[in-house]
Amino acid sequence: MSENRIRIATRKSPLAMWQAEFVKAELERIHPGIVVELLPMSTKGDVILDTPLAKVGGKGLFVKELEVAILEDQADIAVHSMKDVPVDFPEGLGLEVICEREDPRDAFVSNIYKTISELPLGATVGTSSLRRQCQLRASRPDLIIKDLRGNVGTRLAKLDNGEYDAIILAAAGLIRLKLSGRIASFISAEQSLPANGQGAVGIECRTNDERVKALLAPLEHLETRYRVIAERAMNTRLEGGCQVPIGAFAEINGDEMTLRGLVGNPDGSEIIEGIITGPKTEATQLGVALAEELLSKGAKSILDAVYAKA
């Protein structure tokens, strides 16, 4: 492999391509003369579009094929949305870089209504996320929530075609695709706790590839890493996959981190919440401690029931 070349495995969706192009541009800016190639490919999560994600099952629906490409030396790195990245990595691969986070909030998108509270009784809302569903149903049990799959453009088209009164999407994806004008309102973390890692981009590579690791190092954003590590540690202790009714959101003020977490029944009948504060350098311990608190309040029975239905 040329010392001045790097190959990026990426999903083919517009948002995934944006993330890969972002990393490509950053590498070219930091390392003038470097040759960066994009290798777009489809993953299981991209191909199975007629089934709710929670029923597709398994972890790593959007990353496995990319990891195989790195392990087989067809690619040097893979660029991921952190909320899609499983907790465990194949032997020989690791999460080398977490880039600076975009807005982690959920976005309320509607052509008619400005906020969730404006939705009329019995309105139809589209989201495939069990996390969003449980929080939405808890606050508005009258709403009809329907599954929503596909890339951002497909989801917006379904809204525009009148299939839904509103849809909920990650704000970061809309902002990155220059579609922030479609956002009717941002949903506060207090109203809809984000998914762990939401809004952050991670870069995976071979753990023994010192050449690539050195090229990637300047893209690391330490504060984002602390936040995402805490959120993922909580999810790991709860044994959560990609599609679970779990929310986690860390914020940093100086050297202190505050981590909020929740586990909810997808029907909105029960939501277990917790909050913890401590040194940001103890991100993993904070995440595990908060998970233990949620488990002590009964989170395991909710998650067991969700997995039994999947």
From Swiss-Prot:
Q: Which Gene3D superfamilies match?
A: Periplasmic binding protein-like II, Porphobilinogen deaminase, C-terminal domain
Q: Return one Gene Ontology term, BP aspect.
A: protoporphyrinogen IX biosynthetic process
Which pathway is this protein assigned to?
Porphyrin-containing compound metabolism; protoporphyrin-IX biosynthesis; coproporphyrinogen-III from 5-aminolevulinate: step 2/4
Any idea which residues bear S-(dipyrrolylmethanemethyl)cysteine here?
Answer: C242
Q: What is its EC number?
A: 2.5.1.61
GO cellular component annotations, sorted alphabetically?
A: cytoplasm
Pfam families (alphabetical): Porphobil_deam, Porphobil_deamC
Annotated cofactor note: Binds 1 dipyrromethane group covalently.
Which cofactor(s) does the record list?
dipyrromethane
Reaction catalyzed: 4 porphobilinogen + H2O = hydroxymethylbilane + 4 NH4(+)
Q: Name one GO molecular function term.
A: hydroxymethylbilane synthase activity
Q: Which InterPro entries match?
A: HemC (IPR000860), Porphobilin_deaminase_cofac_BS (IPR022419), Porphobilin_deaminase_N (IPR022417), Porphobilinogen_deaminase_C (IPR022418), Porphobilinogen_deaminase_C_sf (IPR036803)
Supply the alphabetized keyword list: Porphyrin biosynthesis, Transferase
Quote the PROSITE patterns the UniProt record gives: PORPHOBILINOGEN_DEAM
Q: Which PANTHER family match?
A: PORPHOBILINOGEN DEAMINASE (PTHR11557:SF0)
Q: What else is known?
A: The porphobilinogen subunits are added to the dipyrromethane group.
Q: What does this protein do?
A: Tetrapolymerization of the monopyrrole PBG into the hydroxymethylbilane pre-uroporphyrinogen in several discrete steps.
Subunit description: Monomer.
| Recorded family membership | Belongs to the HMBS family.
Descriptive protein name: Porphobilinogen deaminase
Organism per entry: Shewanella sp. (strain W3-18-1)
